[in-house]
Amino acid sequence: MKGEVKASSLSPWRRESGLMTKKTVWIENLMGKSNVQFGTSGARGLVSDMNDEVCYAYTAAFVQYLEGVGELSGNGTIAIGGDLRPSTDRIMRAVAKAIVDRGYTPENCGTLPTPALAYYGLLQKVPTVMVTGSHIPVDRNGIKYTKKEGEILKHDEAGMKCQSVTFPRELFDEKGMLTVEVEPPFPHNSAIDAYRRRYVDFFGNNCLSGKKIGVYQHSAVGGKLMVTILSHLGADVIPLGFSETFIPVDTEAMRPEDIVSGRMWADEYACDAIVSTDGDSDRPLISDERGRWLRGDLAGILCADYFDADVVVTPVSCNTAVEKSGLFKTVIRTKIGSPFVIEGMQHARAMGARCVVGYEANGGFLIGSDIDRNGNILKALPTRDAVGVHIAILLLAIERKRKISELAAELPQRYTVSNRLKNFPTERSMAKIAELSTGDEGKDAKAIEAVFSAYFGKVAGINTTDGLRITFSNDEIIHLRPSGNAPEFRCYAEADTENRAEEINKICMGIMDKWRQP
């Protein structure tokens, strides 16, 4: 992705051969035809479905939508970046072409964490486009869009779906691939540098002095940057597990080999903690001194505690220890997905909350208001972030003279376990949820008990905020939810012991697997 955008590709309407014919596509129709669907803050799909034409059209629709709501006015800059997937570079070229053809300049921030690009957009007051598939398999990818003030929300997504975009028919071949050469500008490090300074300036040099931290890099786009930031903060940093091949690390469904590696590394190197992220480095992983990975929602509670939040916004799927801890004045529950968490944070700010934060079950942490700590200001970053979670938990342990395992043990002992069934048809999972949640509470309780009572007893409560969340009379919880951006069926389980939560999850996964066929 070196060099300048080719002059021959600047005009969307003419080439040397003469006048081009136009093609118009409606985004909502393209979604169905291409199988590339909108999920959280953008689009995701199989790489084979995300041809250049689809990626171009979606990005053009994003630009047009921003023009329609007055955020763009025919010229200016849009920052772009990407993760380390092999398909990312090609998709970034299609994104850059769409931006140029709409009269704007793509500013290439290179490969960097999603929150680093979003933060740069907030600082520069420009929209951003991040090419990333996050944690999903390498045969898939995605495009995540943010406005000048942060992530696109659900109403923005609806506005983008309503767009129609027009472009030269000859711009793409019969396979939907670009017929012109596109080279975005040479990448710069300004966004990465700003993200590094964000944490070093706030937390201070040498705040982690004396701590030995392992960094599980794998193929995370922020793997090297994590080492740099923690080193600047004074930690003794040990890079671990770097991979040239992309590894789809899911912070909610850890691979068995990553669980084993965490414990092995902690023992071998005597680490105080091991940290990592998913592929685009917006979802954290952090272990205790024994190499046991903390659940994302548990890490979120500890991070919110460090920042002294008075309002915590979190999806309905997250551990109820946040309420049971009594640490926070208000806990707001939302649907699953960062746009819903952001909307909840915006509401809390409008109601006058002092310090508003949010987190998800995947560990992604969102800061909804500026944080003042010892006279240093950490600016709001209302998008998922990972590095701040690592540092906050490490410093909380230092301040309280505790090991990370001890911090976790001091919270209410509620354990959550989640897993997913891959290649589970979305229409089938949604149909099964609909069978058990008709809106008639008595009828639904009986239907649920017919399936689950032999294992969990009577139903005490049903929550359909997002999927189907069932609380049983023994205070055990199961939450069944189709994924919003992949053919996956997730199950979250919560109980008073880790073994029981694992047992519940295993039972539910077995039941759900039998639902694949009508």
What is each of the regions a protein language model found here?
Residues 22-95, 101-102, 177-209:
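An N-terminal, well-structured beta->alpha segment
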Residues 26-35, 46, 141-266:
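Gly/Ser/Thr-enriched, mixed-charge loops and adjacent short helices
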Residues 71-72, 77-140, 227-289, 346:
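N-terminal small/polar loop signature for handling phosphorylated ligands or for N-terminal nucleophile
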Residues 73-83, 107, 212-215, 311-315, ...:
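Short glycine-rich phosphate-binding loop at a beta-alpha junction
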Residues 235, 239-241, 292-310, 376-392:
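Gly/Ser/Thr-rich active-site loops/lids in small-molecule metabolic enzymes
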Residues 271-273, 309-484, 488-492, 498-518:
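Phosphate-binding and adjacent anionic-ligand microenvironments
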